[in-house]
């Protein structure tokens, strides 16, 4: 499975690299190899946009039924098992699957990351079978993206900060993430940036470059959706206004 994903990513990266190389002189401070990783990240993010949108919609639906959730928590606070059963019944009735979309996104990201790890560790096999000796792989202060970033405060730190911003924005814009049965898991996500930092300082720098760009793109999409998509409360106000208009016409 991972080899298959690595093969697809390698072919995509090679196609992007060849397209860039055919276009002219390579920039001085950033190699086509690095640019290919950035463009590949953008393409992968575009492909996973439906999952991102689904995650956001599930969050909005959960927010809409939050009053009912609060009522159940208050009414059955004496028995956690009964409360969980009532919550599950409410989710089923309302067609809400909290956490499913976000878990799916995490699984997709993990599979891609593992595939990319295989590509970065064996670039010669998956991207340049003819050899990589003559291929530039630098990115500003990094001389070779197939090796770890020499600066701990470079890409590993940027990766941690970008992931922290994504998690923080999700929790701030969706209050239900910090309350109810999902609260413990979501709060534990705040520690993930630290884990990423400790991990990425030892891995090929191409991985934190990919993950940083992926997190920033995801954050941009979330911000756009947050400020453009109508919230449940706004939708209710619109529906009430339509009903009032019809009533007044009669």
Question: Which residues fall in each region the model found?
Answer:
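Helix-loop-helix
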Residues: 1-250
């Amino acid at each position: 499975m991972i080899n298959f994903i690595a093969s697809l990513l390698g072919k995509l990266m090679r196609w992007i690299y060849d397209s860039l190389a055919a276009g002219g002189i390579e920039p001085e401070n950033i190699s086509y190899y690095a640019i290919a990783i950035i463009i590949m990240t953008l393409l992968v993010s575009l492909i996973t946009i439906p999952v991102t949108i689904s995650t956001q919609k599930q969050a909005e639906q959960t927010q809409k039924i939050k009053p009912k959730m609060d009522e159940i928590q208050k009414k059955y606070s004496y028995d956690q098992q009964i409360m969980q059963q009532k919550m599950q019944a409410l989710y089923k009735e309302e067609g809400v699957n909290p956490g499913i979309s976000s878990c799916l996104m995490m699984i997709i990201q993990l599979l891609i990351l593992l595939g990319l790890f295989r590509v970065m560790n064996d670039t010669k096999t998956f991207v340049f079978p003819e050899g990589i000796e003559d291929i530039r792989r630098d990115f500003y202060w990094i001389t070779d993206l197939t090796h770890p970033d020499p600066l701990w405060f470079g890409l590993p730190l940027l990766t941690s900060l970008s992931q922290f911003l994504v998690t923080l924005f999700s929790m701030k814009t969706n209050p239900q993430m910090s309350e109810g049965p999902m609260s413990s898991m979501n709060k534990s996500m705040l520690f993930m940036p630290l884990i990423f930092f400790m991990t990425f300082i030892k891995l090929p720098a191409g991985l934190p470059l990919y993950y940083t760009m992926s997190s920033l793109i995801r954050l941009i999409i979330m911000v756009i959706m947050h400020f453009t998509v109508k919230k449940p409360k706004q939708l209710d106000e619109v529906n009430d206004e339509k009903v009032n208009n019809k009533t007044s016409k009669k």
